[in-house]
């Protein structure tokens, strides 16, 4: 999937509203992930995954801020996410299917927080963007 100029504009515009709330939005998306897909907790056995935990807030912030970096380098995701791709492929060995699950919970969280801005076109743009990010993150898997 190729992001159009209007897709890119929608992603960057919404990112401006997400950035100040990155940790809270990330924590909420992770909490949704763990509640909806409990099998994903296996990668976080060392985390406190309870509501409001510092672990959820810290890691959620990392996830969402990484998406912000990707949005800033939307035309060169391979380079922007190379280090994260290595980490997920060689060290963490996250099941690639989990990226789709997290993508879904991120979109639900964005829709709840930004219901006016997260219209059908913006949702479609974010869906494509998150799919491209997942493709890059899993590109080094063997």
UniProtKB/Swiss-Prot annotation:
Heme b binds at residue 88. Gene3D superfamilies: Globins. PROSITE patterns: GLOBIN (PS01033). Residues 2-142 form the Globin domain. It comes from the Eukaryota. Pfam families: Globin (PF00042). One of its GO terms (cellular component) is haptoglobin-hemoglobin complex. GO terms for biological process: hydrogen peroxide catabolic process. Disulfide bonds: none annotated. O2 binds at residue 59. GO terms for molecular function: haptoglobin binding; heme binding; iron ion binding; organic acid binding; oxygen binding; oxygen carrier activity; peroxidase activity. Keywords: Heme, Iron, Metal-binding, Oxygen transport, Transport. Red blood cells. Heterotetramer of two alpha chains and two beta chains. This is a larval (tadpole) alpha-globin. Belongs to the globin family. This is Hemoglobin subunit alpha-4.
């Amino acid at each position: 999937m190729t992001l159009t100029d209007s897709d890119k504009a929608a992603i960057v515009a919404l990112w401006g509203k997400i950035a100040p709330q990155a940790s809270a939005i990330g924590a909420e998306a992770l909490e949704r992930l763990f509640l909806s897909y409990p099998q994903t907790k296996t990668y976080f056995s060392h985390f406190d995954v309870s509501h409001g935990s510092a672990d959820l807030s810290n890691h959620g912030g990392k996830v969402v801020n990484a998406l912000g970096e990707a949005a800033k380098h939307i035309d060169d995701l391979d380079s922007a996410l190379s280090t994260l791709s290595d980490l997920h492929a060689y060290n963490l060995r996250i099941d690639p299917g989990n990226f789709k699950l997290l993508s879904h919970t991120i979109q639900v969280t964005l829709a709840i927080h930004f219901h006016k801005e997260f219209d059908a076109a913006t949702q479609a743009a974010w869906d494509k963007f998150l799919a491209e990010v997942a493709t890059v993150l899993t590109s080094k898997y063997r």
